[in-house]
C-alpha cells in the first residue's frame, strides 16, 4: 500500500519552516494521541503517520533525503521503511514538545526513568491453627537498603551528581550513520543523565547497601497455601535513590494430623464403637476451638458424614465461615477376652435366627450377587 506524502500528512507546504512543521505536528499529535482517542484504532494509525512524518521533516538531513528520493530514501534497512519503522511506538520522541500535557510522554530525548528496586519473596510455613486464627511474626530478610551516609544518592556527603556532559542530561545520544540518526544509551552515564565524580565510600556510588532487615508481619486469619501478603516498599532499594520494590510473603500451610482443609471447610474422621453406632449416643469430636459434643443416631453406618456448621475456617476475604465435616468410622474391637468373644458369638447367633434383617449392606450385597447370576442365565 502506498504511503501518504509526509508534507500532506502534516498539512504543510514543502517550503514550510521548522517552526511551522513543529506547530503542525503538535496540533495533530494532541488531536490523535492515544490518551485522548480512547482506543480508536483508526486514530491510532493516524497518530503513527503524523509522528513518522514529523521525525523525517524535523531532521534536516532526513528531510533533504526525502525531498530528493521520497519514501525510498528510508527503505532497505534504513531508519524505518515499510511504514512501521518510525511510528512503531507512542511517545518516544515528542516529550520535549508536549510532555507537560501528557505527563512526560516517554521521550527518547529525556532521561531514562529510575529503575525501582527488585521485588522480593519470603516463604512462611504456618500450622493450620495459626493460618485459621492469624498470627503476628517477625521475619529477617536479606536485601538492599538505601545508603544512609549519602541518603541514597551515591555521591560523597557534601557533593552531588553532575549533569552528564556527553548527553547533557538526556540519558541518550544520537549516532550518525550516513543519512540516518540512531539513538543509543549514553555510554558515559549509562542512561541516567548524571555522573558521580566523588562516590560515597559506603555504597561505592550505588546508593544502596546490603543489609538484613527485621520486619513485623501480620498474618490475617483464614489464609491458605498460595496466599500472598504484600508489603509495599519493603523490597530491594533502587540504585541512586530510586524507589524500592515490594516484598511478598508467600504462605504455606503445613498438613494437620487430624484435619484436612478444602477452601473454608474442614474434614476429619471420628472413630466410634460398634455399640454406639448400633444404639446411638453422644460422642466428642475435635474442632480447632476445642472438643464439642455430637449426637450419633442409632444404626449409624461407617462412613456417615455429619456437618457441624460454622466450625470450619473464617474466610480471609469475607465474613463467612466454613463447616466441619465429620466422617464416623466404626472401630472393630481388638484384644477380646474369651468371655467377650463368646458374647459376640451369642449375639451373632441370635441375630442370625431372627426374622428381622440386621445387616442392610450385607443383604444388599448378596441380593446383588444373586441378581448378577440370574441375569447371566437369562
UniProtKB/Swiss-Prot annotation:
Cited PROSITE patterns: DNAJ_1 (PS00636), DNAJ_2 (PS50076), ZF_CR (PS51188)
The CXXCXGXG motif repeats extend over 147-154, 164-171, 186-193, 200-207
The Swiss-Prot or TrEMBL record annotates one GO molecular function as: ATP binding
Tell me where on the tree of life, at the top rank, the source sits: Bacteria
> Where in or outside the cell is it found?
Cytoplasm
Q: Which residues form the J domain?
A: 5-70
- What protein name is recorded for this chain? Chaperone protein DnaJ
**Origin organism lineage:** Bacteria, Pseudomonadati, Pseudomonadota, Gammaproteobacteria, Alteromonadales
